[in-house]
């Protein structure tokens, strides 16, 4: 029997994915999904495998209507259902996009269309799809500043970069929006507001599927690879599954095939990629429980926190680590400190007379028992520091949840991120304790 295809593996996957037959509540009867299915059917989409449902933990997703086998098609969405830059250029916006200089980016074209169609309300041909899109998102760019301040430092920095990027995107697009005034009775400033563009940006950023790059003269040279895929984008992420997803040029459909088995009435998942929880939070606004790719990042400042300040070779050691790419992506994971983190610590812990052995350290060679033990001791101190910091943040979040009810959803999300990181740190502490016993 092939690995991962037996009964035990399926049971394990069900536990990890958190789905069961009794837990999903079918939502096919809801008016928004009835309208969406009519809309999709008119665009040649036929599907009997999946049904919209609400699941605890993951929220709205898609439930299997029948047993699904390995290699079976989960969903095949015709090109006529996809929202791409072709859709936008064929629309009333096409003439304005074509004549605007410099050419708008593919992302701006998609975002402009989403805002315009949402503003159109019941007059929009895309209304059934727009109705099921989230009204708000939980990416860091959408969070209140006081909530962003609670994020791990590395994620907070990326969140602030993300916010600056979206703000610049809005500022640089305002002249283009002004050119669209002839299309609207209302002032375009009230339609294409920052909040409206932020919603559209998050919609594309969190829900788009990847298409082969295309190039159009009327659009900028940025990669034109995004498409919104109605209904298909209800599939939630699990790091424990694998699928094959791509646009089929022969059938002109975006297709997803499963490499797993699904029982009837289980939630069907896809995998957005082997992302850690900080990446999932940043890009999609959620945290994955039991994520095997989850980790805790160690910054340069923390890396040297417990090293002797009297080490005259420290600057040189840091320079070597930087030159060889060992100053970034140093982590604690479910299995303990990463090889990269331990390697960096071993080099930093080299005694003066052993410093010339630094190349051997980077190659994974053992220099001495003393060096091995010292690096493990430092790793343990860093791990305990993180555990203490994480507990302090979780306590702060708990107090804020009591005091600021309006932010409870945002705070709960941040709390889940820190809770997962605490689990990882505790697992790493146990691993380090086991490794240290070899030197006692």
Swiss-Prot record:
Changing residue 420 to G: In a colorectal cancer sample; somatic mutation. Gene3D superfamilies: Rubisco LSMT, substrate-binding domain (3.90.1420.10), set domain protein methyltransferase, domain 1 (3.90.1410.10). InterPro entries: Rubisco_LSMT_subst-bd, Rubisco_LSMT_subst-bd_sf, SET_dom, SET_dom_sf, SET_MeTrfase, SETD3_SETD6_MTase, SETD4_SET. It is found in: Cytoplasm, Cytosol; Nucleus. Residues 48-273 form the SET domain. One of its GO terms (cellular component) is cytosol. Changing residue 233 to A: Abolished histone-lysine N-methyltransferase activity. Keywords: Cytoplasm, Inflammatory response, Methyltransferase, Nucleus, S-adenosyl-L-methionine, Transferase. It comes from the Eukaryota. Residues 1-24 are annotated as: Disordered. The lineage of its organism: Eukaryota, Metazoa, Chordata, Craniata, Vertebrata. Forms a ternary complex with TBK1 and ZNF268; the interaction with TBK1 is ZNF268-dependent and leads to TBK1 monomethylation. One of its GO terms (biological process) is positive regulation of tumor necrosis factor production. This is SET domain-containing protein 4. The gene is SETD4. Pfam families: Rubis-subs-bind (PF09273), SET (PF00856).
């Amino acid at each position: 029997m092939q690995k991962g295809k037996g009964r035990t593996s399926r049971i394990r996957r069900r536990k990890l994915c958190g789905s069961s037959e009794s837990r999903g509540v079918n939502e096919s009867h809801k008016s928004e999904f009835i309208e969406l299915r009519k809309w999709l059917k008119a665009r040649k989409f036929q599907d009997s495998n999946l049904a919209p449902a609400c699941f605890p933990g993951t929220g709205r997703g898609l439930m299997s209507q029948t047993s699904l086998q390995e290699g079976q098609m989960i969903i095949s969405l015709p090109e006529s259902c996809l929202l791409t830059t072709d859709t936008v250029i064929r629309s009333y916006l096409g003439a304005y996009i074509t004549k605007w200089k410099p050419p708008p980016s593919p992302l701006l074209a998609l975002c402009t269309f989403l805002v315009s169609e949402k503003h159109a309300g019941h007059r929009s041909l895309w209304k059934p799809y727009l109705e099921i899109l989230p009204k708000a998102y939980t990416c860091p760019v959408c969070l209140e500043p006081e909530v962003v301040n609670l994020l791990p430092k590395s994620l907070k920095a990326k969140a602030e970069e993300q916010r600056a990027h979206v703000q610049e995107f809005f500022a640089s697009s305002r002249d283009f929006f002004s050119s669209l005034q002839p299309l609207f009775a209302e002032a375009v400033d009230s339609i294409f507001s920052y909040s409206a563009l932020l919603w559209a940006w998050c919609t594309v950023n969190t829900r788009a599927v990847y298409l082969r790059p295309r190039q159009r003269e009327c659009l900028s040279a940025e990669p034109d690879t995004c498409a919104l895929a109605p209904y298909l984008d209800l599939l939630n992420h699990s790091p424990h599954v694998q699928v094959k997803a791509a646009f089929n040029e022969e059938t002109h459909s975006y297709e997803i095939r499963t490499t797993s088995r699904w029982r009837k009435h289980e939630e069907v998942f896809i995998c957005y990629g082997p992302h850690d929880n900080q990446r999932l939070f940043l890009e999609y606004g959620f945290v994955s429980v039991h994520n095997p790719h989850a980790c805790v990042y160690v910054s340069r400042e923390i890396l040297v926190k417990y090293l002797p300040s009297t080490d005259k070779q420290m600057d040189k050691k840091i320079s070597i680590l930087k030159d060889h790419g060992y100053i970034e992506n140093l982590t604690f994971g479910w299995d303990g400190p990463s090889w990269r983190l331990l390697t960096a610590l071993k080099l930093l812990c080299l005694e003066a007379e052993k410093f010339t052995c630094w190349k051997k350290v980077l190659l994974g060679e053992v220099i001495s028992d003393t060096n091995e033990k010292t690096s493990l001791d430092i790793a343990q101190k860093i791990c305990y520091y993180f555990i203490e910091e994480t507990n302090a943040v979780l306590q702060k979040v708990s107090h804020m949840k009591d005091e600021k009810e309006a932010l409870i959803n945002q705070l709960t999300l941040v709390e889940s991120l820190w809770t997962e990181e605490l689990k990882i740190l505790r697992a790493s502490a146990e691993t380090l304790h086991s490794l240290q016993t070899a030197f006692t």
